[in-house]
Design a protein with these regions (language model features):
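Hydrophobic helix-and-loop "lid/oligomerization" segment in the mid-to-C-terminal part
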Residues: 1-6, 13-49, 64-65, 69-72, ...
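Short, basic, helix/turn surface patches
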Residues: 56-65, 127-132, 212
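Short alpha-helices
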Residues: 101-171
Length: 222
């Protein structure tokens, strides 16, 4: 079972899907916990459902049904128990793996069999893109998984501008070789004209206070 932080974002889903496909190829049953009602990856989620991942996702409220004594819980992009999408699953699982790049907090998960922590990595998606290369050619991600991983990296690095290193670009090059289409990934970040205009209105209303831009929004903007 793969899970991440509450209110799933692109780096979490990218890392989850990046692990899902190779693990499934190994003949293991694997599920990704995703709250379909409250997440920030609706466009990528819908796209993955059309690309063969329709059975990959489960809701948090039914995740416990998939947990047994032998279940391995892989937690990505978070390392504190109270931020996990399904904390009750974590409490029940005896075998836990953590993959995260954030600075270690005081209340970190201390019972993991593997705690893969790399604060110099740009994102959890980058870390997973590196890990799956060691699985061998037989268990490599498909193009859909590669695009999900690349999308996660692009979001966390602001299109490869912030927090990038040599390994970031090496991971991106690997995903490109695995079939990731950069044009399709870019489309995941596209918004409608209406949403763009609404954002522009918000930005134009910003007030500068102590070198910070502050906006007041009275309605929800996608």
């Amino acid at each position: 079972v793969v899970t991440g932080v509450q209110t799933c974002a692109l780096p979490i889903l990218g890392a989850g899907v990046g692990l899902y496909y190779p693990i499934q190829q190994m003949g293991k049953q694997v599920k990704i916990i995703l709250n379909s009602r409250a997440n920030m990856v609706k466009q990528l989620h819908a796209r993955l459902l059309e690309q063969g991942f329709e059975t990959a996702f489960i809701e948090p409220e039914v995740a416990l049904d998939y947990v047994s004594d032998d279940t391995l819980l892989i937690i990505v992009d978070v390392h504190t128990p109270h931020f996990i999408e399904a904390p009750e699953v974590y409490k029940k699982c005896k075998n836990v793996v953590v993959i995260d790049h954030h600075r270690k907090m005081v209340d970190y998960i201390d019972n993991a069999v593997i705690f893969h922590h790399e604060p110099y990595a740009s994102s959890a998606s980058e870390m997973v893109a590196e890990l799956v290369q060691y699985f061998g050619d037989k268990f490599k991600p498909n193009s859909a998984a590669a695009e999900a991983l690349l999308a996660g990296m692009m979001l966390d690095t602001k299109n490869f501008i912030l927090r990038t290193g040599v390994r970031t670009f090496e991971a991106a090059a690997y995903l490109r070789r695995m079939g990731a289409d950069t044009v399709e990934v870019k489309r995941l970040f596209a918004s409608t004209m209406q949403a763009y205009q609404e954002r522009c209105k918000v930005v134009s209303s910003a007030k500068i206070y102590r070198r910070c831009a502050i906006c007041s929004v009275s309605q929800k903007i996608d």
